[in-house]
């Protein structure tokens, strides 16, 4: 969609929340960490809610998003002999995933019966790297939709 907007005077917005849901399923689902002790896999994108827009004003393309993300994890303990204890489910949420967030400002809430510290230590850095790519991918995918025709 190319918009007629002389001199880029008007704000042009595009709702990208549906795209963001697909993005997380395509790019974050099955994110994995594995070492000699653990295998941690993101098994489902449970919820992507909030706002996600790409906008243009005065020729500059920006993205504005404020979302809550919820994911499910599977954790396998490789050294555990007891089959009932060698794997368990966990969840991880990002209560505020926002456009002006710095890398060290990400908050990850982990729900698990066991091994929260290990999930935070090993899996969160892998997930964070993927989440940090979102903003550039969002703009790259939608900038052309909000820029005016010349």
Language-model segments: which ranges?
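Long protein-protein interaction modules used by eukaryotic assembly/scaffold proteins
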Residues: 1-23, 27, 31-150
């Amino acid at each position: 969609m190319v918009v007629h907007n002389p001199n880029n005077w008007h704000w042009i917005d595009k709702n990208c929340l549906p795209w963001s849901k697909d993005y997380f399923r395509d790019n974050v689902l099955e994110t994995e960490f594995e070492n000699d002790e653990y295998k941690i896999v993101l098994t489902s994108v449970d919820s992507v809610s909030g706002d996600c827009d790409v906008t243009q004003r005065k020729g500059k393309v920006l993205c504005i998003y404020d979302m809550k993300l919820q994911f499910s994890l599977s954790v396998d303990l490789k050294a555990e002999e007891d089959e009932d204890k060698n794997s368990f489910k966990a969840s991880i949420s990002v209560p505020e995933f926002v456009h002006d967030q710095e890398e060290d400002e990400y908050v990850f809430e982990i729900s698990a019966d066991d091994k929260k510290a290990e999930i935070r230590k090993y899996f969160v850095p892998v997930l964070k790297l993927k989440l940090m790519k979102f903003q550039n991918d969002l703009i790259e995918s939608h900038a052309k939709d909000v820029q005016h025709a010349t």
